[in-house]
Structure formats: structure tokens, C-alpha cells
Amino acid sequence: MSSSYHAFGLALLLLFSTAGCAGLAPQASSPVDADADADATSATSRFESLASVQSFRALQASIEEMSEVILADAKSEREVSQGMRFLLRTLAMAIDVQGDGNPRAPHFARMDTQVRKVGGDNPDAEYDLVVLDNRRDYVIHGNVGSVRHLSFTVMGGRERGRATTIGYFNERTLDPDEQGRFSLYLTRGDPGNAHHVDTTHGVSSILVRQYIGDRGREELASYEIEVLDPERGAAVPYVTDAEIARAILGTRWAFTSLSTLHRTVMPELLDDPNRFIAANSDDFGADISGSDNLYMLGSYQVDEDEALIIVTDPLEVSYWNLAVESRWHESVDYMSRRTHRTLEDVVVDPDGKLRFVLAHGRTPHPNWLDTGGNREGFLTFRWVGQRDVRATLPVIRRVKRSELESILGATIAESQAR
């Protein structure tokens, strides 16, 4: 907040606290004022029973509740500040993908921006979500581009807030033509197309993941969705109060779910920092991870005068990346800060090992990573491959920052010579 804004706020505060503001002191209400207040109350209360109003009231309460979660779980002022901004960004994303969703006129909503990457999402990826229902049939037309990995997770009805997978396609099973074009049908009957998902028993959304090795060289996939309506060209019906209420409830569910990931997705990792465990999508659910995804999850703890040396074996897979997250599972400043790396931007050491150095700010090591200013947080090592792949768990060594050059001298010297 700028100093001029502070000055304005202070001046306003002083203005209303001086003796000259005695005229602003509460005055006895006249009968006319009382009648006006009663009319205003009556005018607002007559709409209170609307489903959209009730849903919005619940969302307001959840915002307050989530702010208390941040205050209760944060360990530092920085985590509180980042946490409040995280809530703002999470709410914005929930509004984008759920609040603005319309199954009658569907569109793919981008889940992140150049400054927003929350929910443990991969910084080297793009995510899109579209809200659907099974009262309509749909078709998706697109092009797979040249990204390392593309997947469509089609989610059915929700049980206790969690989604079930009713269809999954990746860049191979979409069977694109020579130009990369593909089509995917979502219908309540078989349209006679091999790339088809039966939505007879319900469909709620599709989550699209694009994993990128090198943003400068790879072309993102493109795709659009349309309703297969026999009355093509007819005007989309006006949205109803019930539909808006459902959209607000969906926004609230997404907001509260993402705001509490640090409590629901392996929070015990923070109790035993600087180590990794293995996991896959079965451990999280389709609404969090893709069927092709495998993970090594960990947490970090490092002081300003320290560094973490992360050692692992290079993975022989089509895609992998390592991401540093805050306590709130946010990739802080991901477009301007080195908080993530892929297989395309690392150097393998002469001994065949892959090493990363995580610290507060840049270090001389070629595979350096930045904490984003946080002493503690999560680490996500994800890759795309067969489920029977058994990768060696990375090992984390906590050292003094001043010791880095003596420990990794050869690697650092080689990097500086390039």
C-alpha cells in the first residue's frame, strides 16, 4: 500500500476524530427517519429467501472462516500476509472456474494467471476447467499442440464434494490426426465415435492439464467445447436463481477445499521436514491429480543462512518437474522467481546424479531454487509415466549456505565456466 494512501487514510481518520466533527455525532432519529429505515429493511428482507442470496451469505461466512484458518495455522508474519493474498487469489480462481460456469453455454476457464498459481498446481503447466451437466450432449474439438503431456479428466457426479472419474484421455489416447486435431464426445448415448464418454449417469466438469517442458519452444494445446443441441442457433435461456445459487455454492466449495489443502493433503509432512514420500493419483482423487501422474511429495525447512541439497537419479520419463510451494500450496511469484524446474532446464552432475539447491535467493549452483521467502513449505516432484515405475526417493541434506562451495565445488565451478 502506497504512502500516499496511508496519508489519505490518516487524514480522513483525523478529520472524523477532531472536535470540529461534533456535528457528526449520533442524533436522535426522527419519526420520518425511523419509517425510512423500516422501509429499507423491508425492501432487502423480501429477497433474503432467494437461493442465490442464501448461497452468497454462506460464501461470505466461508471467507471469514478461511481467514481464521490462515491466522491459526501460519507460523510467521510472512505466511499470514501471503495467506491473505492466497485467499484472494483462490477466491478469484474459484469464481473464474465455478462461479462463471454455465453448462448451457460452456467454456474452458483458465485456472491460473501469470501471478496466480494455487492449489498445488504445477507451475510448468496450464489448467483449464469447464462446468457441465448431463442434461445436454457436448463435443470438444481441438489440437494437441506440442506440449510434453496433455490430459482430459472427465468427472461425473460428486459424492460428499469429491468427484468420480468417468473418462480419461491423454495426448496418445485422443488419437490426433497428422495435424494434431482431435474430437471428444460427451453424450447420453453412443454417438458412434471411438472417443466418447457416456454421461448418462452424470457429469460435472472436465479438467484439462498441459505439462510443459520448455515454454519457449512448446506450443500449447487448443480446444473448444460446444453443446450438441438439435435447436442449434436458438438463444441460450435466461439463467435462473437456482442456477446462480449452484454456481455460488460451487465457488464456495472450490474456495474452501483449496484453502484447506494444507490440512487435508498429507499435513504430516510438515512435522517431519526435508524428506520425500511416494504417491500417485489414487492417493488424492481425480479432482486433484491426473491418472498418469506419479509423485514424490515432501516438505522443506531451511533458515536464511542455510541451504538444502536435494539429490536424486534422473528419471527416464517423458516429463517431470520439481516445484517449491508455500505452506498454503501456492507457487509464490512463479513467473518471476525460480521456484520450479523441469527436465528441460537442469544440469546433471558428472556422477550421473541430479542435484538441486534450495535456499533463500539465488545460489551459484546451476539447479538453484528459491523458497519464495518462506522458511517452511511443500515440495512436489511429479512426473508422467507408468504406474509401476519405481523411482528412487530424493534425499535432502541441510547445510550451511557458506558450506555450499566446498560441498559442491566441482559442479559450481563447471557451471560458472559455462
Residue ranges and their predicted role:
Residues 24-27:
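C-terminal region of N-terminal signal peptides and the immediate post-cleavage residues
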Residues 31-33, 37-418:
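A compositional/structural signature for long, glycine/proline-rich flexible linkers
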Residues 1-9:
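Bacterial N-terminal signal peptides that target proteins for export
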